[in-house]
A protein has these predicted regions:
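NTP-dependent small-molecule kinase module
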Residues: 2-7, 32, 117, 138, ...
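Hydrophobic anchor at the beta1->P-loop junction of P-loop NTPases
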Residues: 14
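P-loop (Walker A) phosphate-binding loop of NTP-binding proteins
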Residues: 17
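Walker A/P-loop
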Residues: 23
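Post-Walker A helix-loop "phosphate-sensing" segment adjacent to the P-loop in P-loop NTPases
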Residues: 31-42
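ATP-dependent small-molecule kinase phosphotransfer cores
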Residues: 40-100, 122-125, 130-131
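A glycine- and Lys/Arg-enriched "phosphate-lid" helix/loop adjacent to the NTP-binding pocket
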Residues: 101-154
């Protein structure tokens, strides 16, 4: 309706491959909107009393995904939040559809080349980027794992309400790009400079 101001979404879910900047962009975006930021992986670790790698070691990916699903559902009680999801959180029909119904989903898109550059030093702490002996992948093996995972996950990521390509952008520029994408939805009335 013309002249009627749209309400901002109660929750903004940031999704994308590990290393795309969800945990870096999220707090800055939240500050600009007057929202609170939460990282879903941090919430899972707090509730489990273990790190993500420890959860993977003790129970495998299946146990981790069950805890992740439960933590995602808990965000329904949060208002005025920017929520950084894990790289695989919304790579399932059930979780993606739930997030699409319960907030605005923003996919932070990054090229494979940039992901390899960002993730090479961090592979030691990322179970999905390790071999069967829990050793970090490197070089061509790391690139192949990223390509393989991204190929499967991007089908889900691209269903987000907003897709924001952050390649070549500084963190500040990426925050501005997300804000620009959200403005059409009416979030800008809360924006702080």
């Amino acid at each position: 309706m013309e002249g009627q101001e749209l309400s901002p979404p109660v929750r903004i879910y940031l999704t994308g491959f590990m290393g795309c900047g969800k945990s870096t962009i999220g707090p800055l975006l939240a500050r600009r909107l007057g929202y609170t930021f939460i990282d879903l992986d941090t919430l899972i670790e707090q509730q489990a009393g273990r790190t993500i790698p420890e959860i993977f070691t003790m129970g495998g990916e299946v146990a981790f995904r069950a805890q992740e699903r439960a933590a995602l559902r808990q965000t329904a009680a949060l208002e005025a939040y920017v929520i950084a999801t894990g790289g695989g959180t919304l790579a399932s029909e059930e979780n993606l559809n739930w997030a699409l119904r319960n907030g605005r989903v923003v996919y932070l898109q990054v090229s494979v080349e940039e992901l390899v550059r960002r993730l090479a030093p961090a592979a030691i702490s990322r179970p999905m980027l390790q071999d069967q002996h829990r050793q970090p992948l490197q070089g061509a093996a790391l690139r192949q794992r990223i390509v393989s995972l991204l190929r499967r996950r991007e089908l889900w990521y691209l269903q987000a309400h907003h897709v924001v390509d952050t390649d070549g952008l500084s963190v500040a520029e990426a925050v501005e790009a997300v804000l620009h994408a959200l403005r059409a939805y009416g979030v800008s009335r809360n924006e702080r400079r």
